[in-house]
Amino acid sequence: MSHEAVWQHVLEHIRRSITEVEFHTWFERIRPLGIRDGVLELAVPTSFALDWIRRHYAGLIQEALGLLGAQAPRFELRVVPGVVVQEDIFQAAPAEAPRPKLNPKYTFENFVVGPNNSMAHAAAVAVAESPGRAYNPLFIYGGVGLGKTHLMHAVGHSVAKRFPHLKIEYVSTETFTNELINAIREDRMTEFRERYRSVDLLLVDDVQFIAGKERTQEEFFHTFNALYEAHKQIILSSDRPPKDILTLEARLRSRFEWGLITDIQPPDLETRIAILKMNAEQRGLRIPEDALEYIARQVTSNIRELEGALMRAIAFASLNGVELTRAVAAKALSDIFAPRELEADPLEIIRKVADHFGLKPEELTGSGRKKEVVLPRQLAMYLVRELTRASLPEIGQLFGGRDHTTVLYAIQKVQELAESDREVQGLLRTLREACT
């Protein structure tokens, strides 16, 4: 991990621990110079800033480095006059935070598509190509950290590039509510309504939080109607489908269901490895396959935690001056994750899949090529690969001594089917639950 990336992670921890005024005053102008012998070197603009940071924030910086895996967290401050400092370090925080902007990291190009998110991705691409005409509104739901916000921002970037004249607004439900409260208090409702009802693409994150807020629901109802009737595109994200959002007004629920509702599921093992590979490549790093697979097997819940685990492993290796191997990754994550044992026995997976299809296990592992056996066998190979540590050659041996290329073909075939066939997606979920 580069020294800039290490410092960014340190800043994220510090920002959660102090006030915004403190952060902007003392940390916004610090610049990382490099990492030498495990010591993070930082540039500050004045000797006064150096002394103040050393006396008041040294422990916080060391704590942040320790969380990244540094065994002996150390940093060094150096005065570099060229580093710009705020003119007024006692400047008050702005009355209103700047409006959210699209995250430049969230694009279609770096969104890893897998069986868990293929439909949501396809719908988002369709909307980006023809906003206001395809799937309006588009409602994307799924657990925390699975890529809903990434897809929304990706649509925003794509629309901005294709249709630069269109006005785009991204907002979280919390921000929408807070701005509404401020607008009511300051008698600026006309301005508030104009802001949201004059856009061509409205992206609303975490819309489940609108539930139970009567005035917010009332205002959003009219905003939704104004945009929909003008054929403007609306994209909503939530952690659950509209029917499961308790205390959501029926009229809003019905409107959320007017367009397309699509979900994002947790990524399977192959998709998690692909996500880690892309993250590593974006940072110009080549990480051994077995190290990536180890991390992918430890973090199964969501992409945000998966990427966080990778960053921790990279930082641990960088700060301790070692190569990132499987063993180093295990050490870096040891205090967060207990080593995950095999989640299922390969033979048990084969038996469960055979039972589901009314077959005998030996029919799946045998050489028969009957049509009714081919797909169950491919599904069994796929699940053994996902739910155990068995290598491709080992899986081949389980299935009658088949070549590893045959196993790889079966896995890829199931992935292709799952991307386009919701029945196969559901079948995989059912079998996965039965096997774990």
UniProtKB/Swiss-Prot annotation:
<keyword id="KW-0547">Nucleotide-binding</keyword>
<dbReference type="InterPro" id="IPR003593">
    <property type="entry name" value="AAA+_ATPase"/>
</dbReference>
<keyword id="KW-0963">Cytoplasm</keyword>
<feature type="binding site">
    <location>
        <position position="148"/>
    </location>
    <ligand>
        <name>ATP</name>
    </ligand>
</feature>
<dbReference type="InterPro" id="IPR018312">
    <property type="entry name" value="Chromosome_initiator_DnaA_CS"/>
</dbReference>
<dbReference type="Pfam" id="PF11638">
    <property type="entry name" value="DnaA_N"/>
</dbReference>
<dbReference type="InterPro" id="IPR024633">
    <property type="entry name" value="DnaA_N_dom"/>
</dbReference>
<comment type="function">
    <text>Plays an essential role in the initiation and regulation of chromosomal replication. ATP-DnaA binds to the origin of replication (oriC) to initiate formation of the DNA replication initiation complex once per cell cycle. Binds the DnaA box (a 9 base pair repeat at the origin) and separates the double-stranded (ds)DNA. Forms a right-handed helical filament on oriC DNA; dsDNA binds to the exterior of the filament while single-stranded (ss)DNA is stabiized in the filament's interior.</text>
</comment>
<dbReference type="GO" id="GO:0016887">
    <property type="term" value="F:ATP hydrolysis activity"/>
</dbReference>
<feature type="binding site">
    <location>
        <position position="145"/>
    </location>
    <ligand>
        <name>ATP</name>
    </ligand>
</feature>
<dbReference type="GO" id="GO:0005524">
    <property type="term" value="F:ATP binding"/>
</dbReference>
<dbReference type="GO" id="GO:0006270">
    <property type="term" value="P:DNA replication initiation"/>
</dbReference>
<feature type="region of interest" description="Domain III, AAA+ region">
    <location>
        <begin position="101"/>
        <end position="317"/>
    </location>
</feature>
<dbReference type="InterPro" id="IPR001957">
    <property type="entry name" value="Chromosome_initiator_DnaA"/>
</dbReference>
<feature type="binding site">
    <location>
        <position position="147"/>
    </location>
    <ligand>
        <name>ATP</name>
    </ligand>
</feature>
<keyword id="KW-0235">DNA replication</keyword>
<keyword id="KW-0067">ATP-binding</keyword>
<feature type="region of interest" description="Domain I, interacts with DnaA modulators">
    <location>
        <begin position="1"/>
        <end position="80"/>
    </location>
</feature>
<dbReference type="InterPro" id="IPR013317">
    <property type="entry name" value="DnaA_dom"/>
</dbReference>
<comment type="subunit">
    <text>Oligomerizes as a right-handed, spiral filament on DNA at oriC.</text>
</comment>
<dbReference type="GO" id="GO:0005737">
    <property type="term" value="C:cytoplasm"/>
</dbReference>
<dbReference type="Pfam" id="PF08299">
    <property type="entry name" value="Bac_DnaA_C"/>
</dbReference>
<dbReference type="InterPro" id="IPR038454">
    <property type="entry name" value="DnaA_N_sf"/>
</dbReference>
<dbReference type="InterPro" id="IPR010921">
    <property type="entry name" value="Trp_repressor/repl_initiator"/>
</dbReference>
<dbReference type="GO" id="GO:0003688">
    <property type="term" value="F:DNA replication origin binding"/>
</dbReference>
<dbReference type="GO" id="GO:0005886">
    <property type="term" value="C:plasma membrane"/>
</dbReference>
<keyword id="KW-0238">DNA-binding</keyword>
<keyword id="KW-0446">Lipid-binding</keyword>
<protein>
    <recommendedName>
        <fullName>Chromosomal replication initiator protein DnaA</fullName>
    </recommendedName>
</protein>
<dbReference type="GO" id="GO:0006275">
    <property type="term" value="P:regulation of DNA replication"/>
</dbReference>
<feature type="region of interest" description="Domain II">
    <location>
        <begin position="80"/>
        <end position="100"/>
    </location>
</feature>
<feature type="binding site">
    <location>
        <position position="149"/>
    </location>
    <ligand>
        <name>ATP</name>
    </ligand>
</feature>
<dbReference type="GO" id="GO:0008289">
    <property type="term" value="F:lipid binding"/>
</dbReference>
<dbReference type="Pfam" id="PF00308">
    <property type="entry name" value="Bac_DnaA"/>
</dbReference>
<comment type="similarity">
    <text>Belongs to the DnaA family.</text>
</comment>
<dbReference type="InterPro" id="IPR013159">
    <property type="entry name" value="DnaA_C"/>
</dbReference>
<feature type="region of interest" description="Domain IV, binds dsDNA">
    <location>
        <begin position="318"/>
        <end position="436"/>
    </location>
</feature>
<dbReference type="InterPro" id="IPR020591">
    <property type="entry name" value="Chromosome_initiator_DnaA-like"/>
</dbReference>
<dbReference type="InterPro" id="IPR027417">
    <property type="entry name" value="P-loop_NTPase"/>
</dbReference>
